[in-house]
């Protein structure tokens, strides 16, 4: 159980920051639920909640991220596919990159935006484990690769090793795919195997295992800004989020003085 839910040391250091940056970008109830107003010494719970409800948020974080993203994606990227330009599977992928209706451009625009919020996100490419007799059957059933975006709080552990050619390669990736009450599902990617564990309370059960035919982990870390630590990025709103919180508290003080 401990080995399944164990997290990277760097994850533990950064998880509170990721939550703060996410709430700062989302605003609204997400920000209010973070309780970022400084509490007065003799203030009770009801008074504190009332002050939170009365204090507006001027969301600078969302403005910074969205303006920067709109500037980058003002013109769509140009891609050269060579002989694959007429490939049916490729064109299906370009139109629906994540099997959820988002085109590749829309998916990458969203990935760029979230990497700006968190500092980085993970992109995993997978393909349904459906047996098709022919290529035509695959195309008919839309059995093709697709992308998944994983935000940092759901990538619990990872490991890089330097290959013989000097390049660093990802050798392990632990992803929390879903959580519901005390029930959670973890997928651990390695170069030779892919294992899925269901964790209920304190008990972990191996529910699926398969060979990894690629011999590599089909995942990349998309950085908003690189940090000195591999697998960790630097958020675009690192300073803005704290400035926004200070303004938020100052607005509360002004509102209290007026009242």
Name each model-derived stretch.
Residues 205-259:
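Extended, charged amphipathic alpha-helical segments
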Residues 46, 55, 60, 179, ...:
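Intrinsically disordered, low-complexity regions of eukaryotic proteins
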Residues 89-96, 145-163, 216, 221-228:
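Generic detector of solvent-exposed, compositionally biased contiguous segments
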Residues 104, 109-207:
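Extended, Lys/Arg-enriched charged tracts that mediate electrostatic binding to polyanionic substrates
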């Amino acid at each position: 159980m401990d080995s399944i839910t164990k997290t990277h040391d760097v994850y533990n250091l950064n998880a509170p920051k990721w939550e703060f940056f996410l709430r700062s970008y989302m605003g609204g109830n997400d920000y209010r639920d973070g309780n970022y107003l400084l509490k007065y010494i003799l203030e009770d719970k009801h008074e504190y909640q009332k002050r939170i409800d009365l204090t507006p948020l001027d969301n600078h974080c969302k403005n910074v991220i969205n303006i920067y993203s709109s500037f980058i994606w003002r013109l769509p990227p140009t891609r050269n596919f060579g002989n694959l330009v007429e490939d049916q599977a490729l064109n299906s992928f370009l139109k629906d990159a994540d099997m959820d209706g988002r085109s590749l451009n829309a998916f990458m625009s969203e990935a760029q935006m979230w990497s700006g919020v968190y500092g980085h996100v993970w992109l995993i490419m997978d393909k349904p484990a459906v047996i098709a007799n022919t290529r035509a059957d695959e195309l008919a059933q839309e059995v093709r690769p697709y992308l998944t975006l994983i935000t940092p709080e759901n990538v619990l552990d990872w490991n890089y090793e330097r290959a013989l050619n000097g390049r660093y390669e990802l050798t392990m990736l632990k992803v929390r795919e879903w959580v519901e009450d005390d029930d959670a599902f973890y997928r651990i990617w390695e170069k030779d195997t892919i294992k899925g564990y269901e964790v209920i309370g304190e008990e972990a059960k191996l529910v699926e295992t398969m060979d990894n035919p690629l011999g590599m982990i089909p995942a990349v870390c998309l950085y908003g800004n690189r940090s000195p630590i591999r697998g960790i990025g630097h958020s675009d709103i690192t300073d803005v989020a704290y400035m926004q919180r200070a303004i938020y508290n100052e607005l509360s003080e002004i509102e209290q003085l007026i009242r």
